[in-house]
Amino acid sequence: MSTDTTPRLIDFHSHWGTERGWRGSPYETAADREALRGYFKWGMSFVSDEEQAEQFRTANARVMLDFAFTYTMEVGAVREQHDYAFDFARRHPDVVLGHWIGIDPTQPAHVKELERCLSDGPGLIGLAVHSFTPAGTPDEPGWEACLNLCREAGRPVLVHVGMSATGAGTRGGMGITLEGSHPRYVDRVAARHPDLNVIAGRVAWPWQSEMIATALHKGNVWMELHGWSPRYFPGELKREIGKRLRKRVFFGADYPMLSHERLVAEWREQGYPADVLDDVFTGNAEAFLAEIGVA
């Protein structure tokens, strides 16, 4: 139940606060965490499974969780991570909405693992697409089998757009080129797959105008805004959230780097009417979930 101080949240994108949840990531060791620590001003202090669940309850949040870097792993290790995530979800269904599945679509065993997750995973299961995987940008042929699996299952695909925190501030940016996160790839995937629900993840800066145009043009495109304080949203995004994008935007946090409590306070600072915030925090997500048949 929402209160004046703690609204009910459906968080369409956060990560794990547990050490196990960072297995396989570029930040698995303490030395590798310094760049991320500086970018988010987050101390990288981990919590237990139970502490994580309690933090979500305190925030009144139901969360879509993302490992992000499982595409780099051998398939047996990927399956172990997914089983860990699914066990956590089954023990804490009140705070876990579901999971974004990140795989390497060039590996047939990874594609089979996605198929298993879509079939057996608890809650909402969707595919997370990163352009820096071996398959390249999401409009490349290597992604087609996975996109079709999601379309057939009636489950969404998350395509990351805009500036990435991964590699930010490091020499060479960990080899990641930002062009691969241009909204043009959301536009292309949505056009080719009109029966596929495509969610653009993050604020799309420095291409926010293109992302707004894509969301307005394609009825199968939504936006979730994890990883950014609303204080720093581009001006045109701030304006359109209360206007033409009002029904197209989902709340996303990026826990544990950004806490739910901080983001709620900063959303409220922007001066949106209460009914607009209700749509962003829960209403739009509830309508979307009802449309795809997820409780």
How should these model regions be labeled?
Residues 1-15, 19-58, 63, 245-250, ...:
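Mid-to-C-terminal alpha-helical segments outside catalytic/metal-binding sites
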Residues 13, 85, 117, 150, ...:
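Conserved, mostly hydrophobic/aromatic
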Residues 17-20, 71-74, 105-109, 163-167, ...:
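Active-site environment of divalent metal-dependent phosphoester hydrolases
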Residues 20-26, 113, 169-172, 211-213, ...:
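Short aromatic-enriched loop/helix-cap "lid" or pocket-rim segments at secondary-structure transitions
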Residues 26-28, 41, 74-76, 167-180:
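Short, flexible/disordered intra-domain loops and linkers
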Residues 47-53, 82-86, 110-114, 183-186, ...:
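Alpha-helical scaffolding within the catalytic cores
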Residues 62-65, 72-167, 295:
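Active-site gating/metal-coordination segments in enzymes
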Residues 121-126, 135-250:
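Catalytic pocket-lining loop regions of alpha/beta-barrel enzymes
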